[in-house]
Structures are given as structure tokens and as C-alpha cells.
Amino acid sequence: MSTRTIIVLTLTALLASACALGDKRIYNHKIFRPNATSYLIAGGTNSRAVPTFIVGNPFGIAPATLANVVSSSLQSAFPGRDVTFATRRTTGLRDDVFMVVAFDPPKTASAQRICRSRGRISSITVGESIRTLMAFCLAGTPLVSIESKVARGSGTGDKTFVLLLRDMARRMFEAKSKNEI
């Protein structure tokens, strides 16, 4: 074999072994960010159950009730898709991707901040409307996020609130990640 052939085969083998190490390193590289929707509907055992963290309770209702409303509102954004938003810790859930829904986060709260903290931020009730910040995160980095407001007078049973969450999720996953190439 010629020296050139040996070099080409060696480089090909090195490249193949680097890919075999796992795509986690590639996906975590700050330049490469895949489409958020691809992550949301990725296949695998229980991989479509997305851990969802809820910050704040603007209506002062039972946390389980708020969790059910948020989960079902988000799921209604994806009719016909096998994806669920798990608001309670369950075994077998993915830990690389998660959703954060923050009600009345501080003005300084950003998608980056709520993704890094996995929703462990305070909630501050201010004004006549409820600021809602939603982010879909990959390993603590937001792939996509969206912010909106709803009148404080509406409650979780109010159709306006349910439609707001559903429409936010639809718009968010239609958007392309700013880091996507």
C-alpha cells in the first residue's frame, strides 16, 4: 500500500472513532445546535416524555392542578404526536432536554437564566398581567424560548390561559434556534 492510502485510511478510521465516541460531545459544542423540534419528537424509550419545570403559581391554586393544566395545554399544541410534558419526576425521563414554564419571573430573568437554574428562580407578582416565559432547554442552554402576557384576571380554567400556553408552544417550536446551522 502506498503512504497516501495509509494516511487516508488512518484519518478515516480516526474520524469514525471520534463519531463513535458519542454524539453528546458534538451536540454540546456551542456552534452546533439541532432543531428543537427534532429533540422534542426524538425516538427512544420514554424519550418523548419531556421533564417540565413550573415556576410560580399566579392563581394560588393547588400545584397539582396547575401542573395538569400546563401539561395538557402544552400537549394540545402537538396533536397526533406522541409527546408528553411530565411535571412530576419519573424514572426513565430524559435529562438532556427539559421545558421550563415561568409565571411572573423577575424582569431580569432570561431564557438562559431559567434553563441554567432548571426553573429554580423566584416568582414576583407585579402589575395587571401575568408575564409568562417558556424555554425548551438542552443541557442548560435554551434551544428556543418565547415570552407573552395574559390578563391577571383569567384563571387556569379560563380558556384564554389554556390557549395562551398552547399557542406559545406552537409558536416556539415553529421558530428556528438562533444557534442552529
List PLM regions with ranges.
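A mature extracytoplasmic/lumenal domain signature
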Residues: 56-58, 103-107, 136-140, 147-150
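A structural "domain/chain start" motif
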Residues: 19-76
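Surface-exposed short loop/turn segments
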Residues: 93-137
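Solvent-exposed, acidic/flexible segments
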Residues: 59-67, 127, 154-162
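Short acidic low-complexity segments
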Residues: 82-95
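Non-catalytic macromolecular-recognition regions in eukaryotic signaling proteins
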Residues: 45, 71-84, 117-124, 180-181
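Sec-dependent bacterial lipoprotein signal peptides
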Residues: 1-19
